[in-house]
Amino acid sequence: MVHPVQVGKRTRMSFSRLKEVGQMPNLIEVQLDSYDWFLKEGLQEVFDDINPIQDYTGNLNLEFVGYKLDLDSIKYSVEECKERDSTYAAPLKVKVRLLNKETGEIKEQEVFMGDFPLMTEQGTFIINGAERVIVSQLVRSPGVYYDMTVDKTGSKLFSATVIPNRGAWLEYETDSNNIIYVRIDKTRKLPITILARALGYGTDAEIIEFFGEDERLKATIEKDNTKTREEALLEIYKRLRPGEPPTVDSAESLIESLFFDAKRYDLSRVGRYKFNKKLAIHLRITNQIADQDIVNPQTGEILVQKGEKIDKDKAIEIQNCGVNEVYIKIDDKSFKVIGNHFVDIHSLISFDISDLNIKEYVFYPVLKEILDNYADEESIKEEIRKNIYRLIPKHIIREDIYATINYELGLSYDIGYKDDIDHLGNRRLRSVGELLQNQFRIGLSRMERVVKERMTIQDQEVITPQALINIRPVAASIKEFFGSSQLSQFMDQTNPLSELTHKRRLSALGPGGLSRERAGFEVRDVHHSHYGRMCPIETPEGPNIGLINSLATFAKVNEYGFIETPYRRIDPKNKRATNDIVYMTADEEDLYVIARSDEPIDENGYFMDDKVTVRAKEEVLVVPVSEVEYMDISPRQLVSVATAMIPFLENDDASRALMGSNMQRQAVPLLKPQAPIVGTGIEYKAATDSGVLPKAKNAGTVAYVSADEIRVRRDSDGGIDKYKLLKFKRSNQGTCINQRPIVSKGEVVAKETLLADGPSTDLGEIALGKNILMGFITWEGYNYEDAMLISEQLVREDVFTSIHIEEYEAEARDTKLGPEEITRDIPNVGEEALKDIDERGIIRIGAEVRSGDILVGKVTPKGETELTAEERLLRAIFGEKAREVRDTSLRVPHGEAGIIVDVKIFTRENGDELPPGVNKLVRCYIAQKRKISVGDKMAGRHGNKGVISRVLPEEDMPFLPDGRPLQICLNPLGVPSRMNIGQVLEVHLGLAASKLGWHIATPVFDGAIESDIVDCLRKAGYSEDGKTVLYDGRTGEPFDNRVTVGYMYILKLAHLVDDKIHARSTGPYSLVTQQPLGGKAQFGGQRFGEMEVWALEAYGAAHTLQEILTVKSDDVVGRVKTYEAIVKGENIPEPGVPESFKVLIKELQALCLDVKVLNDDNQEIKLKESVDEDVDELEVNIEGAENQLEDKEEKEEEKEENYKEDSDEYDDLREEDVEPDLEELSLDDLDLDDFGDEH
């Protein structure tokens, strides 16, 4: 039944039937928690890994004792960092201790280790003034993976891979002769028995005794030509280090360092957890029949007798009492199962050890040694602390390798199972914290090398920690990560939703991940383990489809980096749904059967039906109630935030829903945001978590409200909290960020109450578009191919008007000929052009500018030329005054116009940090009001997108019987073939709701159904089919059929025609071919390509063809003469030879072919090498505006030179964030707009 729900300050009528259990987590906690972990634990782990650094003699010992981020000495606030192009960071100070073992002297110092970028409260970083997001990466989890292939004879071949976090890989494979091979670190393969011998089982008898009788093992031993441990070691050494003289000692130490050295081989916590989970003996002996008595080694009691079946609890008990080898019976054969000897420490120690914080399994032999030698609690705890790295080794151990080999042998007896690498139990997230930690570790290990070198060079008596440590490698690796890693992206700030989604994005690309080319179909596909963890709908269309995903609404990331989703526990005794919520990873979930969230249950939680629909792995089954163990907590838990904002998602086709999710993220913030009439109820949560809205830090009373500041008097101590609002700031994408207060003076606010609206929010709900009265009706062909017909009212009343702010900067540099100067005194510029320029040479705020207007007047010294006699005379009379300068002012680029809203000036005198060689920097911000116009792209939320084809006067639009004209006409043919019926239901419900004055929440998969909509239409007094008679605005006649009319929520997308339209007559030309450049950014021309030439040839349009290929393109002399002729009104001269023809001739000559050009009389035509003289004589420059491109190149060269000169200062330079020009970009570099959809 429809019922009211309070969201923020608005009441929505909700159609949901289910009571949601449990709260949605904070939507950006992926970022916040991960960074928090890094500061608290991640950094410490890296220091622990690297401690202590010893010199080669073992005398000096350098240790990192502790660290702190000095949050008090942060240079600038977040806002100031954005203004000053600096990085929001805090200094990292590390306490370092140096011990000289000879003298016993200890020196301690606090060492500054560079500025460490801090995360803002919104989950972003400010790097060089630009807001960036670190995207989480989906990678394969370290662990051991088994796979099976079937060869052509039909026999099963098993293989395995042991993947560490870092270190050498081990791969096992079986060939069709049943011989098992191993590859160490991707080298050639060896029989696996060689590895077993080298690790300690030297003879054939020992191998067979340890691993048990097995056909494949015997076949492998026959193939193996080594017979002792020494031979095996030498054989492995020859393979791994070919060309070096093999000795047993060096081979032993090689294997030690490859696998058993924590500095070279790291499984990481996740790897150890996955290893123990996969190789635990209890999983493989459960439900098998014991072939010998199994005895508890501590007490001697028989746990399982020969011939008895081992149940699950017994199997766990067997493992935890330290039994590592069990014989089981399979088809009259005895098979020996070997585990990796890890046990649950809590089952072996009777007293409380929770303060040791051990969650993982521990290595039994080490634990047994401790328990045998110590008796009292304290000393046992102390020993466990001391031996923690032996109990939970970070590297692989021999027992692990034996267990992996045994697992491989067992697979052919159907013991164990093969792994699915696309399962989310085998893929994990590396979030900000871990990515940073890895980067920091790289920097520290580079530093370690430097420290060791310095230890040997410098005098050991007077040496200090400060003198040993060089922080540059650490600072550089962090800087490089934030500045240029594929996962550090320029934040998509088009609107709050795009910001939120960017922070929740999961990418399988990036360093250590997949590449677009290698990723096959399986990796990209939807997998059953994605349910509730990753959205099956929101992903880009294009080369990245399925590689970039979005986190589902309720998902969390656990300490190991696996994505978890919440379920309600079903009480096993009386089978009622409890309110206990359990977060489960994908591999835990596979063990249970899980009911749907909309399964009918009564108010006490009992199921109403005897049979229940459940999910079990990838199956959907119907089972009796008694078998159900868990239940989903919400119908929207399987989709992402953007997808959950599509009402009636359940009635849309998936591919259109995908477009709908992606296009909401491209909606431009409008002048007056308006929340949707038909929403889904998640709008409020999305806006509050996105970080664009100011919230009250403490409870209190509003004491003062103005447009740019809100003050709240705290209840606790009567103090005042001040909140500055952002007014008309530019976002990363050039849209406008503007906050408006929504509280009034005297209002009582609780903690976390929203105080103001931001861009695209309305009363704290995300409001990306407008509710528009529309009808599905064709109109004179203006609806053809998804085009839209709109009413002039939308233009006049600024319904779809948005503000866009562009930033332009000019810098005055030192050049070789003297400094550039910012001034009002510009050569050859009239007073008219300077009317809005102040005395400093900078445009005034509030001035209206058009393309070509001067923003910042700037002159650059010209090179000294040979002076004529007259000039020398003038020089002599007037001194330096006549020195030549040229105008290099910053002008408004082509096709831009607007109003100056802000000007910022940075100079050295004011103490601003500027790049080397720059004396003054001026930034101008130009704002434009863009009304909706023909060619703009608009879309609904259901993937129904289109371009505006015509703006019709209001009086010509079709109108309703009550006289209201429609605002937009959409083509009814856009609905059936696309199967996004959600838009029709939205229109019907919108019609009824607007009449009833309701705002509606219809949550995905749990919203209004057809009967609810019919009830609403009836209540509002409309006919039940939602159709009405429409009248033609031009004639007043009714249309033939009744038409579906109602309110649809429509967005204006960031693909605006003003940014795309472009025209050129003359302009810059390419250097070699002399053809016009391409693209709007280069002020280029339209390419007349091969196929277009064919078209003209087909029509026989010879003269048109000739002029297009010569004077309109690359006939250098001809085009200048033609331009002159047009200007003077003369006849157009004959075309000359195109430059690209000359280039072709030169290329052939470069291939040593003697190519000549002959005329009709077989006379050779001399092609002039250079046409510059001819052009100079003509004295016409058609290269475009004031040689701007030349200046750009000069500037770039200068910058390069400056960088080279200041290579030491390079670290302090800001790296410029240049927004890429999309038309010129190769696909490989495309990060930010990967989700963009250009059709």
Swiss-Prot record:
One of its GO terms (biological process) is DNA-templated transcription. The keyword Nucleotidyltransferase applies. Its EC number is 2.7.7.6. GO terms for cellular component: DNA-directed RNA polymerase complex. It catalyses: RNA(n) + a ribonucleoside 5'-triphosphate = RNA(n+1) + diphosphate. GO terms for molecular function: DNA binding; DNA-directed RNA polymerase activity; ribonucleoside binding. Keywords: DNA-directed RNA polymerase, Nucleotidyltransferase, Transcription, Transferase. PROSITE patterns: RNA_POL_BETA. Residues 1191-1200, 1206-1239 have a biased composition (Acidic residues). The keyword Transcription applies. Residues 1182-1239 are annotated as: Disordered. SUPFAM superfamilies: beta and beta-prime subunits of DNA dependent RNA-polymerase. It holds the Pfam family RNA_pol_Rpb2_45. HAMAP family: RNApol_bact_RpoB. Belongs to the RNA polymerase beta chain family. The RNAP catalytic core consists of 2 alpha, 1 beta, 1 beta' and 1 omega subunit. When a sigma factor is associated with the core the holoenzyme is formed, which can initiate transcription. DNA-dependent RNA polymerase catalyzes the transcription of DNA into RNA using the four ribonucleoside triphosphates as substrates. This is DNA-directed RNA polymerase subunit beta. It comes from Clostridium botulinum (strain Loch Maree / Type A3). The lineage of its organism: Bacteria, Bacillati, Bacillota, Clostridia, Eubacteriales.
